[in-house]
């Protein structure tokens, strides 16, 4: 909360309405001034989902409250969980330890701050956006906005020149080594760009820095020190990874070679590996520059994992000997080796209870020993999967809960029809559509948009507009489409009840819709 002369500015709105109402109650103990502006520093759910705890859509529509963000934020919000939504939500559940027991969460935090709490997610689109920078006055206070891509591509910071205060968003991630790569999966986070953004923050020479995770930093020299050490750590990881890449080292070799020097590794707490790690940052840097192929042609067309495991087990004397060795490694505290050995047996037989038990126990040991919260969560969630506690409806329910945070009903209102239909392209099932050549038009009169989705023998293409020669057409309001996306309704239900107007042969439309795979099946990440 920034208390300006004429009102309040709220920078980021928390992970849910429930939690943010508690925050607002605390703010109201300090000031009863009206809220004049909201700032979204970037599109991640824990920074935007609680907005309606602070303001209403009516206040924003009337102009009473302005919402500031970088110009790409809205696109990022509506696309973050769409194209790769099913796998991203499952992986996010593992990263955040969503299904862990209270016992496994006890005394834990999120690595960069307190654990997030589930609750109602809301969203209101920005009213004021900019590309690179914006100098303005909000509620009588001078504010300088600056776009600084780093932890997110749309990251922005605020500088209050009259107070010499820098609100650094997640360019600094609080008391932890920054997460140059996130295990849940994101597009390449460029360390060079991140370092440049940190240098832009240093140029402010702020007296106080307020990160969106972690404690404020006071004193110009201390602010400079934290920013400099953070940029040097990221630069060191990047530069030394590239240096050794250029000598031919591969990811498995790089992670043993690239380590922070003592003056950086020991800079507590800001560079401790609570959230990011050097090892998984190194791997993504290699991948970002060179891709998956490491140079050994044996990887071009490898033996399938299950067959490879079968051959290795035979070479090692059979399943029993392999699992005896895995059990022996576990008892000796060599948990990584125990997990790897038992994994071969699981590759051959997913229902091998002894192998799953050894691997689960090994992962629990590795998780409890890990200082990094992301690694810990992945180990323990994977152990749950191996123990049979994260299957079927349980896995689907967890995925649904995560999806609700990434794509709430308010966000769906802002999801363009184009994005929704474009997702169909990657849902086409070649077995069902191999002999089909049909096109279906989608008309949305309330937003004056029309699109055509064409199926051509296993390939789908989305086109703008509807050619008069296309005989099949669905006409519906975008408002109704929003309820289809949320799962409240369906196109078939709309056709039966009159919310969707159907033109063309119903059997052809049924054939067309049958070309796509919309089944949400549980995804196993560890038992493979």
Curated annotation (Swiss-Prot):
Does the entry annotate any disulfide bonds, and if so which pairs?
none
Task: Give the residues the record marks as binding Zn(2+) 1.
Answer: 42, 44, 151, 170
Residues the record lists as binding sulfate: 179-184, 189, 275
Coiled-coil parts of chain: none
- The enzyme's E.C. designation: 3.1.6.21
Which chemical reaction does it catalyze?
a primary linear alkyl sulfate ester + H2O = a primary alcohol + sulfate + H(+)
Question: What induces the gene encoding this protein?
Answer: Transcriptionally regulated by SdsB.
The prosthetic group or cofactor this protein requires is: Zn(2+)
Write out the GO MF terms: linear primary-alkylsulfatase activity; metal ion binding; protein dimerization activity
Q: Which GO terms describe its biological process?
A: dodecyl sulfate metabolic process
Q: Which residues bind Zn(2+) 2?
A: 46-47, 170, 213
Q: Which UniProt keywords apply?
A: Hydrolase, Metal-binding, Zinc
What's one Pfam family here? Answer: Alkyl_sulf_C
Query: What general EC class does the enzyme of this chain belong to?
Result: hydrolase
Q: What does this protein do?
A: Alkylsulfatase that cleaves the widely used detergent sodium dodecyl sulfate (SDS), which allows the bacterium to use SDS as a sole carbon or sulfur source.
Query: Record's family?
Result: Belongs to the metallo-beta-lactamase superfamily. Type III sulfatase family.
What is the recorded name of this protein? Linear primary-alkylsulfatase
Q: Which gene encodes it?
A: sdsA
């Amino acid at each position: 909360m920034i208390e300006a002369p004429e009102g309040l500015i709220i920078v980021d709105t928390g992970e849910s309405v429930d939690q943010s109402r508690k925050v607002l109650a605390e703010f109201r103990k300090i000031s009863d001034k009206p809220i004049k502006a909201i700032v979204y520093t970037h599109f991640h759910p824990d920074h935007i989902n609680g907005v309606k705890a602070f303001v209403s859509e009516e206040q924003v529509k009337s102009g009473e409250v302005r919402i500031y963000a970088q110009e790409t934020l809205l696109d990022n919000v509506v696309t973050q969980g769409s194209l790769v939504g099913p796998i991203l939500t499952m992986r996010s559940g593992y990263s955040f330890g969503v299904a862990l027991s209270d016992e496994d969460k006890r005394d834990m935090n999120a690595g960069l701050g307190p654990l997030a709490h589930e609750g109602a997610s809301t969203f209101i689109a920005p009213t004021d956006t900019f590309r690179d920078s914006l100098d303005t006055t909000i509620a009588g206070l001078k504010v300088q906005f600056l776009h600084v891509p780093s932890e997110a591509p749309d990251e922005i910071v605020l500088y209050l020149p009259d107070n010499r205060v820098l609100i650094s968003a997640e360019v600094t991630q609080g008391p932890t080594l920054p997460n140059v790569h996130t295990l849940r999966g994101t597009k390449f986070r460029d360390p060079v760009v991140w370092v440049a953004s940190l240098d832009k923050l240093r140029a402010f020479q702020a007296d106080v820095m307020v990160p969106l995770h972690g404690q404020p930093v006071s004193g110009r020299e201390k602010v400079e020190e934290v920013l400099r050490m953070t940029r040097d750590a990221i630069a060191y990881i990047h530069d030394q990874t590239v240096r050794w890449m250029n000598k031919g080292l591969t990811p498995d070799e790089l992670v043993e070679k690239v380590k922070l020097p003592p003056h950086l590794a020991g800079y507590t707490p800001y560079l401790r590996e609570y959230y990011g790690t050097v090892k998984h940052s190194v791997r993504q840097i290699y991948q970002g520059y060179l891709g998956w192929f490491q140079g050994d042609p044996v990887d071009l067309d490898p033996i399938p994992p299950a067959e490879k495991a079968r051959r290795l087990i035979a070479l090692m004397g059979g399943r029993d000997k392999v699992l005896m060795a895995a059990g022996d490694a576990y008892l000796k505290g060599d948990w990584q080796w125990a997990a790897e050995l038992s994994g071969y047996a699981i590759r051959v037989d997913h229902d091998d209870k002894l192998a799953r038990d050894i691997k689960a126990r090994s992962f629990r040991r590795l998780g409890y020993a890990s200082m990094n919260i992301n690694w810990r969560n992945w180990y323990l969630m994977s152990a749950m999967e191996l123990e049979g506690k994260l299957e079927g409806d349980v896995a689907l329910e967890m995925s649904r809960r995560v999806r609700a945070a990434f794509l709430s009903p308010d966000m769906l209102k802002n999801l363009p029809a184009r994005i929704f239909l474009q997702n169909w392209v990657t849902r086409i099932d070649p077995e069902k559509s191999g002999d089909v050549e049909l096109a279906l038009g989608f008309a949305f009169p309330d937003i004056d948009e029309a699109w055509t989705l064409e199926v051509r023998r296993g390939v789908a293409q989305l086109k703008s507009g509807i050619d008069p020669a296309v005989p099949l057409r669905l006409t519906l309001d975008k408002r109704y489409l929003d309820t289809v996306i949320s799962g409240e309704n369906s196109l078939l239900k709309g056709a039966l009840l009159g919310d969707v107007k159907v033109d063309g042969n119903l059997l052809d439309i049924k054939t067309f819709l049958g070309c796509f795979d919309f089944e949400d099946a549980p995804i196993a990440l560890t038992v493979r």
